[in-house]
């Protein structure tokens, strides 16, 4: 697949973000038979290009939010609108860290869609220099070892926890089920990617905010699960 076939950050704008958020929320509501979802209605050419995306669901509790689900896809196997729809349903009902979302929770959640660039492997002979190749606030990370171990952390996670690049590497290793220093092993693949974030402000309107990971403020005390 050529890069030209993939959605890029430069393809995106606020209107596309609003449509992606609506697709995500309506995909969840469709499971409860509250709406009839028809992805064919979304004609924007960008939405019909292949894309990579994660959907994060946060639950509002006592004026704070906590993670309620986060699932995504780093293989561009379908149009962006389909990837976001599938990721939203998976985040709501198939994240193994949480019970399936209930109908009663629909009014207490906010949805975030992160569009990813194509992951690229970081190639460096001296593994101790790996942290210097990672830009916290811009890069997300993937750790892969063989076919059994894989872990991904979105770029905004490092910003939210105020991590440095070495801590980010260690936490991604842990997410993959490996030791924190796995990134020093030459057989472990380290990939990085960028992302653009669309976040609901209010579930009752189509108003959203567009964020770069570097815009995210540290709020580590509010998190109990990693994305």
Curated annotation (Swiss-Prot):
SUPFAM superfamilies per the UniProt record, alphabetical: AMMECR1-like
InterPro entries for this protein: AMMECR1, AMMECR1_dom_sf, AMMECR1_domain, AMMECR1_N, AmmeMemoSam_A, Uncharacterised_MJ0810
Domain AMMECR1 stretches: 15-209
NCBIfam families: AmmeMemoSam_A (TIGR04335), TIGR00296 family protein (TIGR00296)
Name this polypeptide is given: Protein Saci_0792
Top-level taxonomy: Archaea, Thermoproteota, Thermoprotei, Sulfolobales, Sulfolobaceae
